[in-house]
């Protein structure tokens, strides 16, 4: 089941913390197996804004992570650009608690290239995922960074660009330029 399919039902029903908990548990299993194999690979684990705000789920989640900081080198928590941009005091405090434990973040579902890379880095974001379509369209407005310059901007700020949703062979060739 793809996230877009279950999220339409889970979000209005207030079930996203439960869904995130299940996904987190599975991600931790994968990370533990990678660690046994001495792999340096990372696993991206999506967390919804609903979970960051959940007064029952999130404190327990942070407490678990406090006891499992060894996961920080392999587990990257991922948030949509909408969640990052819409983060209020509670969400920011939640992210700060995880960052203080050494966990890194990724911003995905990026549709607007107008963001402050330095601010993202300061909040422990180390990855930004942009779709191939967004990169190849190269859409920008006056004064904003062009998609072709995004990789260098992010690199200067200690953030790695990941181009995702590459679905056609021609796109592979085109995105290699980034």
Identify the role of each PLM range.
Residues 19-22, 143-149:
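Conserved acetyl-CoA-binding loop-helix of GNAT-fold acetyltransferases
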Residues 2, 56-58, 87-91, 116, ...:
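Residues at alpha-helix caps and immediate loop-helix transition turns in enzyme cores, especially N-
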Residues 11-12, 37-40, 101-103, 124:
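Short glycine/proline-enriched coil/turn segments at helix->beta-strand junctions
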Residues 10-14, 18, 52, 135-141:
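Short, contiguous acidic/charged loop-to-helix segments that flank catalytic cores in large enzymes
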Residues 1-9, 46, 163:
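Active-site core of bacterial EAL-family cyclic-dinucleotide phosphodiesterase domains
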Residues 15-90, 165:
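Catalytic core of bacterial c-di-GMP phosphodiesterases, primarily the EAL and HD-GYP domains
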Residues 5, 9-10, 23-31, 61, ...:
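Structural preference for long, well-ordered alpha-helical segments in enzyme cores
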Residues 64-138, 149-178:
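The catalytic core of metal-dependent phosphodiesterases that act on cyclic dinucleotides
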């Amino acid at each position: 089941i793809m996230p877009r399919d279950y999220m339409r039902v889970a979000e209005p029903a207030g079930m996203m913390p439960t869904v995130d908990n299940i996904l987190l548990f599975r991600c931790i299993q994968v990370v533990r197996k990678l660690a046994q194999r001495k792999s340096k690979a990372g696993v991206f684990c999506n967390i919804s804004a609903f979970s960051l705000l959940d007064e029952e789920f999130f404190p327990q989640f942070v407490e678990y992570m406090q006891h499992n900081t060894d996961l920080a080198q392999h587990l990257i928590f991922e948030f949509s650009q909408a969640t990052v941009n819409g983060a209020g005091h509670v969400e920011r405090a939640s992210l700060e608690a995880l960052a203080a434990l050494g966990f890194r973040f990724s911003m995905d579902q990026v549709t607007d290239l107008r963001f402050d890379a330095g601010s993202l880095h300061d909040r422990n974001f180390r990855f930004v995922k942009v779709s191939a379509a967004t990169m190849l369209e190269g859409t920008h407005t006056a004064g904003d960074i062009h998609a072709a310059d995004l990789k260098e901007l992010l690199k200067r700020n200690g953030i790695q660009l990941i181009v995702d949703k590459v679905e056609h062979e021609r796109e592979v060739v085109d995105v290699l330029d980034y």
